[in-house]
Design a protein with these regions (language model features):
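Bacterial N-terminal signal peptides that target proteins for export
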Residues: 1-9
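N-terminal hydrophobic targeting/anchoring segments and the immediately downstream early-domain regions
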Residues: 21-191, 245-398
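Divalent metal-binding pocket/active-site signature
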Residues: 151-154, 165-249
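Bacterial N-terminal signal peptides
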Residues: 9-18
Length: 398
Protein backbone atom coordinates (compact mmCIF):
# COMPACT_ATOMS: atom_id res chain seq x y z
CA UNK A 1 0.00 0.00 0.00
CA UNK A 2 3.05 2.24 -0.20
CA UNK A 3 1.39 4.17 -3.03
CA UNK A 4 -0.34 6.19 -0.31
CA UNK A 5 3.00 7.58 0.80
CA UNK A 6 4.78 7.56 -2.54
CA UNK A 7 1.92 9.40 -4.18
CA UNK A 8 1.37 12.16 -1.66
CA UNK A 9 1.71 14.74 -4.41
CA UNK A 10 -0.61 12.72 -6.62
CA UNK A 11 -3.23 12.72 -3.87
CA UNK A 12 -2.93 16.50 -3.54
CA UNK A 13 -3.48 16.78 -7.24
CA UNK A 14 -6.62 14.70 -7.00
CA UNK A 15 -7.84 17.04 -4.29
CA UNK A 16 -7.51 20.56 -6.54
CA UNK A 17 20.63 -4.28 19.74
CA UNK A 18 22.05 -5.96 21.78
CA UNK A 19 24.01 -9.20 21.08
CA UNK A 20 21.82 -11.53 23.16
CA UNK A 21 19.70 -14.04 21.28
CA UNK A 22 15.95 -13.69 21.17
CA UNK A 23 14.47 -16.26 23.59
CA UNK A 24 12.84 -19.21 21.87
CA UNK A 25 9.07 -19.34 22.12
CA UNK A 26 7.37 -21.73 24.47
CA UNK A 27 5.36 -24.01 22.18
CA UNK A 28 1.97 -25.13 23.33
CA UNK A 29 0.07 -23.33 26.05
CA UNK A 30 -2.58 -20.72 25.73
CA UNK A 31 -0.96 -17.45 24.64
CA UNK A 32 -0.12 -15.67 21.41
CA UNK A 33 3.53 -16.46 22.15
CA UNK A 34 2.87 -20.18 21.90
CA UNK A 35 3.23 -20.51 18.13
CA UNK A 36 5.07 -19.15 15.11
CA UNK A 37 3.68 -15.87 13.76
CA UNK A 38 4.46 -14.41 10.33
CA UNK A 39 3.24 -11.37 8.40
CA UNK A 40 3.24 -11.60 4.61
CA UNK A 41 3.87 -7.92 3.88
CA UNK A 42 6.22 -5.72 5.94
CA UNK A 43 7.08 -2.36 4.38
CA UNK A 44 9.53 -1.63 7.21
CA UNK A 45 12.56 -1.45 4.84
CA UNK A 46 11.44 2.10 4.07
CA UNK A 47 12.97 2.92 7.46
CA UNK A 48 16.22 1.00 7.06
CA UNK A 49 18.17 3.89 5.50
CA UNK A 50 17.03 6.51 8.03
CA UNK A 51 19.74 8.57 9.73
CA UNK A 52 20.09 7.62 13.38
CA UNK A 53 17.50 4.84 13.16
CA UNK A 54 18.24 1.22 14.05
CA UNK A 55 16.03 -1.80 13.58
CA UNK A 56 17.48 -3.13 16.83
CA UNK A 57 16.26 -0.24 18.99
CA UNK A 58 12.94 -0.21 20.78
CA UNK A 59 10.47 2.44 19.74
CA UNK A 60 6.78 3.00 20.28
CA UNK A 61 3.91 3.95 18.03
CA UNK A 62 3.74 7.30 19.83
CA UNK A 63 7.37 8.29 19.32
CA UNK A 64 8.26 6.84 15.92
CA UNK A 65 6.67 6.22 12.54
CA UNK A 66 7.90 2.62 12.32
CA UNK A 67 5.28 0.09 13.41
CA UNK A 68 7.75 -2.68 14.23
CA UNK A 69 11.33 -3.25 15.30
CA UNK A 70 13.23 -6.23 16.70
CA UNK A 71 12.34 -5.59 20.38
CA UNK A 72 8.64 -5.14 19.60
CA UNK A 73 8.68 -8.28 17.46
CA UNK A 74 10.24 -10.35 20.25
CA UNK A 75 8.10 -9.08 23.12
CA UNK A 76 5.26 -11.46 23.99
CA UNK A 77 5.81 -13.17 20.65
CA UNK A 78 4.16 -10.21 18.91
CA UNK A 79 5.63 -11.21 15.53
CA UNK A 80 8.26 -13.84 14.74
CA UNK A 81 8.97 -12.61 11.25
CA UNK A 82 7.65 -12.09 7.78
CA UNK A 83 8.31 -10.87 4.27
CA UNK A 84 10.28 -7.62 4.14
CA UNK A 85 9.24 -5.76 1.03
CA UNK A 86 11.27 -4.39 -1.86
CA UNK A 87 8.71 -1.79 -2.92
CA UNK A 88 9.13 0.32 -6.05
CA UNK A 89 6.60 2.95 -7.03
CA UNK A 90 5.20 2.71 -10.55
CA UNK A 91 6.94 4.90 -13.11
CA UNK A 92 7.01 5.34 -16.88
CA UNK A 93 7.17 2.24 -19.07
CA UNK A 94 10.39 3.38 -20.71
CA UNK A 95 13.99 2.18 -20.77
CA UNK A 96 14.93 5.05 -18.48
CA UNK A 97 12.09 4.29 -16.08
CA UNK A 98 12.94 0.60 -15.95
CA UNK A 99 16.63 1.34 -15.34
CA UNK A 100 15.96 3.71 -12.45
CA UNK A 101 13.47 1.30 -10.90
CA UNK A 102 15.89 -1.63 -11.21
CA UNK A 103 18.67 0.31 -9.50
CA UNK A 104 16.33 1.39 -6.70
CA UNK A 105 15.04 -2.14 -6.12
CA UNK A 106 18.53 -3.65 -6.02
CA UNK A 107 19.60 -0.98 -3.54
CA UNK A 108 16.58 -1.69 -1.33
CA UNK A 109 17.38 -5.41 -1.45
CA UNK A 110 20.92 -4.64 -0.30
CA UNK A 111 19.58 -2.44 2.51
CA UNK A 112 17.44 -5.31 3.78
CA UNK A 113 20.41 -7.68 3.72
CA UNK A 114 22.67 -5.19 5.50
CA UNK A 115 20.10 -4.40 8.18
CA UNK A 116 19.35 -8.02 9.03
CA UNK A 117 23.08 -8.86 9.03
CA UNK A 118 23.68 -6.34 11.83
CA UNK A 119 21.76 -8.53 14.28
CA UNK A 120 22.90 -12.12 13.60
CA UNK A 121 22.02 -13.35 17.08
CA UNK A 122 18.49 -12.00 16.90
CA UNK A 123 17.19 -12.38 13.34
CA UNK A 124 18.19 -14.26 10.21
CA UNK A 125 17.40 -14.31 6.50
CA UNK A 126 15.22 -17.17 5.26
CA UNK A 127 15.00 -18.49 1.71
CA UNK A 128 12.78 -21.49 2.34
CA UNK A 129 10.15 -22.89 4.66
CA UNK A 130 12.89 -25.07 6.17
CA UNK A 131 14.99 -21.97 6.89
CA UNK A 132 12.08 -20.46 8.80
CA UNK A 133 11.75 -23.57 10.94
CA UNK A 134 15.51 -23.64 11.53
CA UNK A 135 15.57 -20.02 12.66
CA UNK A 136 12.53 -20.60 14.86
CA UNK A 137 14.22 -23.58 16.50
CA UNK A 138 17.27 -21.43 17.18
CA UNK A 139 15.21 -18.76 18.90
CA UNK A 140 15.70 -16.21 16.13
CA UNK A 141 13.31 -13.94 14.29
CA UNK A 142 12.75 -14.62 10.59
CA UNK A 143 13.23 -12.34 7.58
CA UNK A 144 12.07 -13.31 4.11
CA UNK A 145 12.28 -10.89 1.17
CA UNK A 146 9.51 -10.06 -1.29
CA UNK A 147 8.89 -7.75 -4.24
CA UNK A 148 5.91 -5.42 -4.39
CA UNK A 149 5.60 -4.38 -8.04
CA UNK A 150 7.68 -6.19 -10.65
CA UNK A 151 8.05 -2.97 -12.65
CA UNK A 152 11.85 -2.90 -11.95
CA UNK A 153 12.26 -6.02 -14.10
CA UNK A 154 11.51 -3.91 -17.16
CA UNK A 155 11.44 -6.16 -20.21
CA UNK A 156 14.16 -8.47 -18.88
CA UNK A 157 12.69 -11.45 -17.03
CA UNK A 158 16.19 -12.75 -16.31
CA UNK A 159 16.26 -10.11 -13.56
CA UNK A 160 13.66 -12.18 -11.73
CA UNK A 161 16.34 -14.85 -11.43
CA UNK A 162 18.75 -12.26 -10.05
CA UNK A 163 16.28 -11.26 -7.34
CA UNK A 164 15.69 -14.94 -6.60
CA UNK A 165 19.45 -15.36 -6.20
CA UNK A 166 19.35 -12.47 -3.73
CA UNK A 167 16.75 -14.29 -1.66
CA UNK A 168 13.39 -13.00 -2.89
CA UNK A 169 10.77 -15.72 -2.57
CA UNK A 170 7.47 -13.87 -3.10
CA UNK A 171 6.60 -11.26 -5.73
CA UNK A 172 3.61 -9.43 -7.13
CA UNK A 173 3.42 -8.33 -10.76
CA UNK A 174 1.82 -4.93 -10.23
CA UNK A 175 1.12 -2.14 -7.76
CA UNK A 176 -0.89 1.08 -7.94
CA UNK A 177 -0.63 1.54 -11.70
CA UNK A 178 -1.05 -0.83 -14.62
CA UNK A 179 2.40 -1.82 -15.89
CA UNK A 180 4.12 -3.99 -18.48
CA UNK A 181 2.91 -7.19 -16.80
CA UNK A 182 -0.55 -6.71 -15.35
CA UNK A 183 -3.50 -4.47 -14.70
CA UNK A 184 -3.69 -2.77 -11.33
CA UNK A 185 -6.84 -2.89 -9.21
CA UNK A 186 -6.63 0.89 -8.95
CA UNK A 187 -5.92 1.80 -12.58
CA UNK A 188 -7.56 1.52 -15.98
CA UNK A 189 -7.68 -1.86 -17.73
CA UNK A 190 -5.26 -2.47 -20.58
CA UNK A 191 -4.32 -6.13 -20.88
CA UNK A 192 -7.51 -8.05 -20.12
CA UNK A 193 -5.70 -9.00 -16.92
CA UNK A 194 -2.15 -9.93 -17.91
CA UNK A 195 -0.01 -8.86 -20.85
CA UNK A 196 1.92 -11.48 -22.85
CA UNK A 197 4.95 -10.49 -20.76
CA UNK A 198 2.83 -11.00 -17.66
CA UNK A 199 2.00 -14.54 -18.71
CA UNK A 200 5.71 -15.23 -19.19
CA UNK A 201 6.32 -13.67 -15.76
CA UNK A 202 3.95 -16.25 -14.22
CA UNK A 203 5.80 -19.10 -15.93
CA UNK A 204 9.17 -17.81 -14.72
CA UNK A 205 7.88 -17.36 -11.15
CA UNK A 206 6.73 -20.98 -11.20
CA UNK A 207 10.01 -22.18 -12.68
CA UNK A 208 12.04 -20.40 -10.01
CA UNK A 209 9.83 -21.68 -7.20
CA UNK A 210 8.63 -18.24 -6.12
CA UNK A 211 5.21 -17.52 -4.62
CA UNK A 212 2.96 -15.26 -6.71
CA UNK A 213 1.37 -12.39 -4.80
CA UNK A 214 -1.93 -11.22 -6.30
CA UNK A 215 -2.49 -8.21 -4.02
CA UNK A 216 -2.93 -5.00 -6.08
CA UNK A 217 -3.88 -7.03 -9.17
CA UNK A 218 -7.19 -6.24 -10.84
CA UNK A 219 -9.95 -8.83 -10.73
CA UNK A 220 -9.16 -9.76 -14.33
CA UNK A 221 -5.45 -10.07 -13.51
CA UNK A 222 -6.25 -12.17 -10.44
CA UNK A 223 -8.34 -14.50 -12.60
CA UNK A 224 -5.48 -14.96 -15.08
CA UNK A 225 -2.88 -15.46 -12.33
CA UNK A 226 -5.07 -18.11 -10.76
CA UNK A 227 -5.66 -19.84 -14.09
CA UNK A 228 -2.01 -19.85 -15.19
CA UNK A 229 -0.04 -20.52 -12.01
CA UNK A 230 0.92 -24.12 -11.34
CA UNK A 231 1.28 -23.41 -7.62
CA UNK A 232 -1.02 -21.66 -5.11
CA UNK A 233 -1.29 -17.87 -4.94
CA UNK A 234 -1.05 -15.59 -1.93
CA UNK A 235 -2.68 -12.21 -1.50
CA UNK A 236 -0.13 -10.73 0.89
CA UNK A 237 -2.22 -7.78 2.10
CA UNK A 238 -5.81 -7.74 0.89
CA UNK A 239 -9.30 -7.47 2.31
CA UNK A 240 -12.89 -8.34 1.55
CA UNK A 241 -15.50 -6.48 -0.44
CA UNK A 242 -18.06 -7.74 2.07
CA UNK A 243 -16.72 -5.18 4.57
CA UNK A 244 -15.78 -2.38 2.17
CA UNK A 245 -16.37 -2.37 -1.57
CA UNK A 246 -13.02 -1.21 -2.94
CA UNK A 247 -11.09 -2.46 -6.01
CA UNK A 248 -8.22 -3.58 -3.74
CA UNK A 249 -10.52 -6.00 -1.94
CA UNK A 250 -11.64 -9.42 -3.10
CA UNK A 251 -15.22 -10.62 -3.52
CA UNK A 252 -16.39 -13.82 -1.86
CA UNK A 253 -16.53 -15.80 -5.11
CA UNK A 254 -12.86 -15.11 -5.83
CA UNK A 255 -11.89 -15.84 -2.23
CA UNK A 256 -13.52 -19.26 -2.63
CA UNK A 257 -11.70 -19.86 -5.93
CA UNK A 258 -8.41 -18.87 -4.31
CA UNK A 259 -9.01 -21.34 -1.49
CA UNK A 260 -10.07 -24.10 -3.88
CA UNK A 261 -6.73 -23.70 -5.66
CA UNK A 262 -4.82 -24.01 -2.38
CA UNK A 263 -4.01 -20.32 -1.96
CA UNK A 264 -4.50 -17.94 0.93
CA UNK A 265 -5.60 -14.37 1.58
CA UNK A 266 -3.54 -12.50 4.18
CA UNK A 267 -6.01 -10.18 5.83
CA UNK A 268 -5.00 -6.54 6.04
CA UNK A 269 -5.86 -3.35 7.93
CA UNK A 270 -6.21 -1.15 4.85
CA UNK A 271 -9.41 -0.43 2.91
CA UNK A 272 -11.68 -1.65 5.68
CA UNK A 273 -13.30 1.74 5.26
CA UNK A 274 -12.80 5.01 3.43
CA UNK A 275 -9.35 6.58 3.16
CA UNK A 276 -9.35 10.08 4.60
CA UNK A 277 -6.65 11.56 2.35
CA UNK A 278 -7.08 15.28 2.99
CA UNK A 279 -4.61 17.81 1.56
CA UNK A 280 -2.90 17.98 4.97
CA UNK A 281 -2.63 14.19 5.18
CA UNK A 282 -1.29 13.94 1.63
CA UNK A 283 1.34 16.61 2.33
CA UNK A 284 2.53 14.94 5.54
CA UNK A 285 2.32 11.38 4.28
CA UNK A 286 4.08 12.27 1.06
CA UNK A 287 7.18 13.04 3.13
CA UNK A 288 7.42 9.58 4.63
CA UNK A 289 9.41 8.20 1.70
CA UNK A 290 11.89 11.05 2.12
CA UNK A 291 12.93 9.99 5.63
CA UNK A 292 16.20 8.57 4.35
CA UNK A 293 17.26 12.11 3.44
CA UNK A 294 16.07 13.68 6.72
CA UNK A 295 18.06 14.47 9.83
CA UNK A 296 17.02 12.85 13.10
CA UNK A 297 15.42 16.14 14.16
CA UNK A 298 13.43 16.35 10.93
CA UNK A 299 12.27 12.75 11.38
CA UNK A 300 11.14 13.52 14.92
CA UNK A 301 9.20 16.55 13.70
CA UNK A 302 7.50 14.47 11.00
CA UNK A 303 6.53 11.89 13.63
CA UNK A 304 4.98 14.57 15.85
CA UNK A 305 3.03 16.03 12.93
CA UNK A 306 1.83 12.62 11.78
CA UNK A 307 0.71 11.43 15.21
CA UNK A 308 -1.08 14.72 15.92
CA UNK A 309 -2.93 14.33 12.63
CA UNK A 310 -3.74 10.70 13.45
CA UNK A 311 -5.33 11.77 16.73
CA UNK A 312 -7.26 14.63 15.20
CA UNK A 313 -8.19 13.07 11.89
CA UNK A 314 -7.62 9.29 11.54
CA UNK A 315 -6.51 8.18 8.10
CA UNK A 316 -8.92 5.23 7.95
CA UNK A 317 -12.61 5.20 8.86
CA UNK A 318 -12.24 1.77 10.48
CA UNK A 319 -11.20 0.35 13.84
CA UNK A 320 -10.34 -2.93 15.51
CA UNK A 321 -13.97 -4.06 15.54
CA UNK A 322 -14.21 -3.45 11.78
CA UNK A 323 -11.03 -5.45 11.34
CA UNK A 324 -12.31 -8.40 13.35
CA UNK A 325 -15.62 -8.42 11.47
CA UNK A 326 -13.74 -8.61 8.19
CA UNK A 327 -11.29 -11.23 9.41
CA UNK A 328 -14.05 -13.47 10.74
CA UNK A 329 -15.91 -13.12 7.44
CA UNK A 330 -12.83 -14.11 5.42
CA UNK A 331 -12.21 -17.12 7.67
CA UNK A 332 -15.82 -18.21 7.21
CA UNK A 333 -15.62 -17.89 3.42
CA UNK A 334 -12.11 -19.28 2.82
CA UNK A 335 -11.65 -21.63 5.78
CA UNK A 336 -8.81 -21.70 8.28
CA UNK A 337 -6.50 -23.42 5.78
CA UNK A 338 -6.59 -20.41 3.45
CA UNK A 339 -6.21 -17.33 5.68
CA UNK A 340 -3.04 -15.55 6.78
CA UNK A 341 -2.00 -12.10 7.99
CA UNK A 342 -0.58 -9.09 6.16
CA UNK A 343 -1.49 -5.88 7.96
CA UNK A 344 0.58 -3.62 5.67
CA UNK A 345 2.70 -2.39 8.57
CA UNK A 346 4.80 0.63 7.62
CA UNK A 347 3.02 0.87 4.29
CA UNK A 348 -0.18 2.67 5.27
CA UNK A 349 -1.63 -0.01 7.54
CA UNK A 350 -2.81 0.36 11.09
CA UNK A 351 -6.16 1.49 12.47
CA UNK A 352 -7.59 2.58 15.80
CA UNK A 353 -7.01 -0.24 18.27
CA UNK A 354 -4.53 -1.96 15.95
CA UNK A 355 -1.81 0.65 15.60
CA UNK A 356 1.28 -1.54 15.51
CA UNK A 357 2.41 -5.13 16.04
CA UNK A 358 2.01 -4.90 19.80
CA UNK A 359 -1.74 -5.34 19.16
CA UNK A 360 -1.29 -8.79 17.57
CA UNK A 361 -2.13 -10.71 20.77
CA UNK A 362 -5.55 -9.01 20.73
CA UNK A 363 -6.31 -10.67 17.40
CA UNK A 364 -5.39 -14.08 18.76
CA UNK A 365 -7.50 -13.54 21.88
CA UNK A 366 -10.53 -12.56 19.83
CA UNK A 367 -10.15 -15.54 17.51
CA UNK A 368 -9.95 -17.85 20.51
CA UNK A 369 -13.09 -16.23 21.91
CA UNK A 370 -14.78 -16.86 18.55
CA UNK A 371 -14.08 -20.58 18.96
CA UNK A 372 -10.99 -21.13 16.83
CA UNK A 373 -8.51 -23.69 18.16
CA UNK A 374 -4.79 -23.25 18.69
CA UNK A 375 -4.26 -25.52 15.69
CA UNK A 376 -6.43 -23.18 13.61
CA UNK A 377 -4.44 -20.19 14.80
CA UNK A 378 -1.12 -21.84 14.00
CA UNK A 379 -2.29 -22.41 10.43
CA UNK A 380 -3.43 -18.82 9.98
CA UNK A 381 -0.47 -17.16 11.70
CA UNK A 382 2.21 -19.06 9.77
CA UNK A 383 1.31 -22.58 8.68
CA UNK A 384 -0.58 -21.60 5.55
CA UNK A 385 2.16 -19.26 4.34
CA UNK A 386 4.84 -21.89 4.89
CA UNK A 387 2.72 -24.53 3.15
CA UNK A 388 2.36 -22.31 0.07
CA UNK A 389 6.05 -21.42 0.13
CA UNK A 390 6.89 -25.13 0.25
CA UNK A 391 4.50 -25.83 -2.63
CA UNK A 392 6.27 -23.20 -4.74
CA UNK A 393 9.65 -24.69 -3.83
CA UNK A 394 8.43 -28.16 -4.75
CA UNK A 395 7.13 -26.89 -8.09
CA UNK A 396 10.36 -25.18 -9.14
CA UNK A 397 11.91 -26.24 -12.42
CA UNK A 398 8.53 -26.77 -14.05
Amino acid sequence: MRQIAARGAWALGLLALSSCATPAKRRGGDTHAAFLTLDAHLDTPVHFARTGWSFGDRRTYANDLAQLDIPRMADSGNLDGGFFVIFTDQGPLTAEGYSAARDFALKRSDEIDATIARFPERIGMARSAADARRLEAGGKLIAFKSIENSYPLGEDLSLLGEFHRRGVRLAGPVHGGTNQFAESATDKPRWNGLSPSGERWVAEMNRLGMVIDASHASDAAFDRLLALSKTPLVLSHSGTKAVFDHPRNLDDARIRKLAAAGGAICFTTIYLGALNMTPERAEVFGKHDQMGQMSSAEQADLTVRTRALDARQPMWSADFETYMAGLLHVIKVAGVDHVCFGADWDGGGGIAGLEDIEAHPKITARLRAAGYSWADLQKMWSGNLLRILQAAENGSGN
